[in-house]
Every structure is written in C-alpha cells, then in structure tokens.
Amino acid sequence: EEFGGQDLNDVLNLILLLANEPKADTSRMGVYGFSRGGMMTYLLLRKSCQFKAAVVGGGPTDLLKWIPKRPEMETYVYAELIPDYHNNKEVELKKRSAIYWADELCPTTPLMILHGSADWRVAPENALELLVKLFELKHPVRFLFLEGAQHSLAEFRQEARNSIRSFFDHYVKNENPLPDMELHGR
C-alpha cells in the first residue's frame, strides 16, 4: 500500500491474470475507479492504453491543493502510506496528481468524469480543473456534474449508474469509435 505508488502494479498484474481466463476478453476492457480508486484510474491511464473506456467518480486530481482543505489526509494518509513522503513531498504528490500530467493520459481511452457539486471529501474543483485541461488537449471526455450531490453521489445514484453503464456500453460493449474532437457542425 503506497497510495498510488507500486500498488498500481497490482492492478496491471490483474490484466495478465485475466488474459488466462477463457471467458475474459482483454481486448475490450473498461476501468472504473471512485475516490482514491479514481486517482488509481488516472495513474493506470498514464501507464496503459489497454482500456476501451474509463470512468472516474469523485477522484482527486491535485493532492497538493487538497492539503489545506483536508489536513488530516496529509497526517493519516500521505505521511503514513507514501514512501519517502517527508523528503520529497511535492514530487510524490505530483506523481499521484493527474492535473500535472493530463497530457500523458492515454489519448485513445475516452474518459467519463462524475463529481458531486457538494462533495466536501474531494473538492469539485479537482474535476473541473482537469476537465478544462482535457478539453484543451482534445481528450475525449464526458462530464457529469451532479448538482447538490455529495461525495458518494447518493442523491443521484441511479442516474450515475445509468450514465456509467451507457458510457461503457458505447465504447466497450458496442466498440464505437472515438469521437471527432475537432470543432465541427453547422
């Protein structure tokens, strides 16, 4: 457990295991992570283009900005779990913060980001700032900002589930091509 360090390899190794499963089709995989799992999903998309689609719900994208809003995260999570944290705080946090390397996310993996506007655990600005960067990079991204929703999106649970399923069906199950991200239309 390194909060986004070597523990990422556990997920990548699962793909190798799946390749040996007769019922698994590793040419059509999606990945979904929520909260800390969302951070892990961004890290996966930085290392691999094996996924047909990815969904992140309530994922932190800038751990440095998170410290003033959630100081307990530094004390009980970062300092406890991240190797060499005290000597290389900024470097280690940026390694785990997609906002600093959005241009390194797999460009062929469409991404859906969900976030609640009333999320106190992971500030909504995390999603909004990354969305702007992804838009500038012309990365295929779908964004669902749920008004008044808390971190778990409990107020819109069914809507969120339906949106996620539709997104995965579109890109993973039905294998639709990536959208044209250039300006077009009349």
Describe the predicted segments one by one.
Residues E2-P22:
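Alpha/beta-hydrolase active-site loop
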Residues Q6, G59, L64-E104, E136:
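Mobile cap/lid helix-loop segments that gate and shape the active-site cleft of serine hydrolases
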Residues L16, G38-C49:
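Short glycine-enriched nucleophile-adjacent loop
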Residues K23-S35:
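Alpha/beta-hydrolase fold nucleophile elbow
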Residues V31-G33, G57, L114:
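Short beta-strand immediately N-terminal to the catalytic nucleophile in serine-hydrolase-like folds
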Residues Q50-D62:
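A conserved short beta-strand
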Residues M112-H115, D119:
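Short beta-strand/loop motif that positions the catalytic acidic residue
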Residues E125-R186:
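C-terminal catalytic histidine-bearing segment of alpha/beta-hydrolase fold enzymes
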